[in-house]
């Protein structure tokens, strides 16, 4: 096993809970899904489709991030790039940007990491 693989196995990474109050059910419970931290591979996929993803994050890129990372509690992907992408692109921008912001919150800046 490579050193990089050994080091990655040492880390315990928990999924982040994402709550979308605007998608609440009839009882008022927000739609909840899970998202693991954004990885280098995720950024590679997003940058291939959306140049300068981190510097110029478009709504389309946010939708692709949601499709890429959103999972059920059991780890199943929730959205697909076909029909779901078209539906998500029709959603209000504030909802999409709020979800993407919660997903980006899993990224810890160098400055914040140094504080810990």
Residue map of PLM features:
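Residue-level marker of intrinsically disordered, low-complexity segments enriched
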Residues: 11, 15-18, 36, 57
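Generic cytosolic/nucleocytoplasmic N-terminal low-complexity/intrinsically disordered segments
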Residues: 4, 18-21, 48, 114-115
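Extended acidic low-complexity intrinsically disordered regions
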Residues: 1-14
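Short, surface-exposed, charged amphipathic helix/loop patches that serve as local interaction elements
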Residues: 27-116
């Amino acid at each position: 096993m490579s050193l990089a693989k050994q080091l990655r196995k040492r880390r315990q990474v928990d999924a982040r809970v994402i709550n979308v109050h605007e998608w609440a059910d009839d009882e008022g419970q927000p739609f909840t899904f899970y998202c693991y931290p954004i990885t280098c591979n995720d950024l590679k996929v997003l940058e291939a489709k959306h140049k300068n993803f981190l510097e110029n994050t478009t709504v389309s890129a946010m939708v692709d991030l949601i499709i890429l990372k959103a999972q059920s509690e059991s780890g199943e992907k929730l959205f697909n790039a076909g029909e779901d992408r078209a539906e998500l692109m029709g959603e209000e921008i504030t909802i999409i940007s709020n979800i993407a912001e919660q997903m980006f919150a899993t990224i810890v800046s160098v400055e914040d990491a140094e504080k810990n």
